[in-house]
Amino acid sequence: MYTLKEGIDFYIEPMQSKKVTVFDTTLRDGEQTPGVSLTSTQKLEIAHQLDKLGVDIIEAGFPISSEGDKESVKSISNAGLDTTVCGLARVLKKDIDACFESDVGLVHTFVPTSDVQRIYTIKKSREEVIQLAVEAVQYIKDHGLKCMFSAMDATRTDPEYLIEVFKAVQEAGCDIINVPDTVGVMVPSAMYRQIKGIAAEITIPIDVHCHNDFGLAVANSLMAVEAGASQVQVTINGIGERAGNADLSQTVMSLTSIYGAKTNIRTEYLVETSKMVENYTGIRLPPNTPVVGQNAFSHESGIHSQGVLEKSDTFEPGIMTPEMVGHRRRIVLGKHTGKHAVKQSLESAGIKTNDNQLDEIVIRIKEIANKGKQITDADLYAVASAVLGKASSEEELIKLKEVSVMTGNILTPTAVVKADIEGKEIIAARTGVGPVDAALHAVRDILGESNHFRLQDFRIDAITGGADALADVYIGLENEKGRIVTARSANPDIVMASVEALVNAMNLLYKKENKS
């Protein structure tokens, strides 16, 4: 057990002295995500962003796959980036030549080594596979470039044969070997044992490439580093073939924040980079995506949000803050929200309330949330404005009790309003050109002869998107003396929002007349 931050202990072995190289394959394996096709311009922009992020190696593409891909890799190679640009190649001279023509600084060559892939895809014997691998490595090294060799489907390859392959390419001059979990079948404990066994036999650096078919890509990558790997292959947002690859943000933040390892990643650009790739690929992240997702540092529960507001370490990792990854902390308002969070959110916007007003705002927020509505900041401020704009209960002339409306294509819109006026229950019914018009006429009628005002302003805004948008109604009333008051109300029901706004305005007018 060791401590990275005071009061927070971790039951793992630390890696403060270990440096891990980050190999990003978003532009190669990531682009193989079903439905994703990036333009050359987009790939170049992503490459610049990855360089800004600080990745050590960018696998820019598979040059032999198409002339367009080769030109894209070449443009990235010649973009003046600080990172090393890599091209993928099978153990074939034509593939490797395409990498040379793309001006890459590293060639990543591969060949299947598992029996199932070797027999059914390339139809070669074990001996022939070793010969192809060695010849490819030698060809790359003879041209003065760095070489990484991948034993494709390594995690389903006979362990003794795999070591034999790696020893052969190491002797041929390979700079680094890659152990790919090509179909994502490893579990962390098995990954640890495999990498530990390879590290005991091989002296050159070990890289891992983990797929996420069972959701274990990040965990397997971390176990590989624990066992001796010094380089991890990752993609932005975990995109890639099938279920994707190890996610860069999750892998890097786990390595640096939990293990204490070092990388060259400038973590403050993680969210920015994630959003760029999200926009260009069209693959939207679930809100609960770790590190970079919308909810990664969001809190709704009253207990959680109050704890975070007092001290963020209470219900956040503590060793990873939103600022570290370019994110921001959000207190999300909803049906689980407590008064503390609502008060904090209001005060951050300069809105002060007394206890009664705060109680009513919380009640309204929860009423809206219980209808399945997500509460935004705009919703909160509209609700707060409606509550703060009301007269206090003891100064209310009108206490609204009930509103009902009928409308349809063969019905005349009709509204019935029930309210208490100075302790007396009044009911009024009116028709109108629509349900809102009918309801407002009915509200005015409940005052009878005391109805000495005119509607000076009336505005309705949908302050949030969607069919369930919150209606924000603003009303201006003017009495016979020229006194003007304004009031507003917010409600998912546009009729109720309109009625509440008018009643609020009428009560404010009554309050001001009594105090004048």
Swiss-Prot record:
GO molecular function: 2-isopropylmalate synthase activity
PROSITE patterns: AIPM_HOMOCIT_SYNTH_1, AIPM_HOMOCIT_SYNTH_2, PYR_CT
Keyword entries, A-Z: Amino-acid biosynthesis, Branched-chain amino acid biosynthesis, Leucine biosynthesis, Transferase
Pathway, per record: Amino-acid biosynthesis; L-leucine biosynthesis; L-leucine from 3-methyl-2-oxobutanoate: step 1/4
Catalytic activity: 3-methyl-2-oxobutanoate + acetyl-CoA + H2O = (2S)-2-isopropylmalate + CoA + H(+)
EC number: 2.3.3.13
Domain Pyruvate carboxyltransferase: 20-271
CDD domains for the chain: DRE_TIM_IPMS
Keyword Cell inner membrane in record: no
One of the GO BP terms on file: coenzyme B biosynthetic process
Superkingdom of the source species: Archaea
InterPro entries the UniProt entry points to: 2-IPM_HCS-like, 2-isopropylmalate_synth_dimer, AIPM/Hcit_synth_CS, Aldolase_TIM, LEU1_arch, LeuA/HCS_post-cat, LeuA_allosteric_dom_sf, PYR_CT
Entry similarity comment: Belongs to the alpha-IPM synthase/homocitrate synthase family.
Function of the molecule: Catalyzes the condensation of the acetyl group of acetyl-CoA with 3-methyl-2-oxobutanoate (2-oxoisovalerate) to form 3-carboxy-3-hydroxy-4-methylpentanoate (2-isopropylmalate).
Protein name: Probable 2-isopropylmalate synthase
Organism name: Methanosarcina mazei (strain ATCC BAA-159 / DSM 3647 / Goe1 / Go1 / JCM 11833 / OCM 88)
